């Protein structure tokens, strides 16, 4: 079902990805998007959100480092993107960590129709109202079924859900896929999940089926990380980061097809 040609579409079209993101990851996200052939813009002034919504091919909202002005900009941008027909991706970083983050995400979900939501299991469990022990912005631990969480959030908010982890889970509420790829070094570099949200956004920008786009984005991203790890002399995060950027830039459809481990099903049983 997956031919992994969306990567070539991203390179061909160079979608403009508007990121309202956090101060920790902005540089890495921009460079990662450039590496895959997308065109990033990192803008958060509320005064220009309406204009950017008409220009951008996708909007990616990341709540990693929040403040009141930024939240206002997110809401303006998201509403304007909905009016313009621009897809919107939410990365609810650390939503389960504080009551303020939970409040902001609930407001965003109430005011904006999101095409996709990408986060770790703890973040999506918080949105689903499932018990989970959050650990700051990390996944933490919990016993809830990840597929059930994905299904619940996808159906409640009419969106595609991407839950990142050792095995990524993607669902639109009726279709489900698991991607069992990825380097163990990815969680050891800050912002790897945030960049994945932006990469998912760039794939969604060139494909009407957000579920298919998200599965291909996750698989391609994870396979690239595996190739980066192969090039390492020492399995250390500082050495891995630049090699991963290079791997993103040298992605090929053939490499992804050769290594992607995708399990797809039509329903969650």
Swiss-Prot record:
Gene3D superfamilies membership: 3.40.1190.20
Q: Please identify the protein, giving its name as recorded.
A: Hydroxyethylthiazole kinase
Binding positions for substrate?
42, 191
User: Where is ATP annotated to bind?
Assistant: 118, 164
Please name one Pfam family that this protein belongs to: HK
State its role: Catalyzes the phosphorylation of the hydroxyl group of 4-methyl-5-beta-hydroxyethylthiazole (THZ).
Q: Which reaction does it catalyse?
A: 5-(2-hydroxyethyl)-4-methylthiazole + ATP = 4-methyl-5-(2-phosphooxyethyl)-thiazole + ADP + H(+)
The upper taxonomy is: Bacteria, Bacillati, Bacillota, Bacilli, Bacillales
Which keywords annotate this record?
A: ATP-binding, Kinase, Magnesium, Metal-binding, Nucleotide-binding, Thiamine biosynthesis, Transferase
GO BP of this protein: thiamine biosynthetic process; thiamine diphosphate biosynthetic process
Documented EC number(s): 2.7.1.50
> Which family, according to UniProt?
Belongs to the Thz kinase family.
Would you say which domain of life the source belongs to? Bacteria
Please state the pathway this protein functions in, per its UniProt record. Answer: Cofactor biosynthesis; thiamine diphosphate biosynthesis; 4-methyl-5-(2-phosphoethyl)-thiazole from 5-(2-hydroxyethyl)-4-methylthiazole: step 1/1
Query: Is Magnesium a UniProt keyword of this protein?
Result: yes
**GO MF annotation, one:** hydroxyethylthiazole kinase activity
- What cofactor is needed? Mg(2+)
Q: What class of enzyme is it?
A: transferase
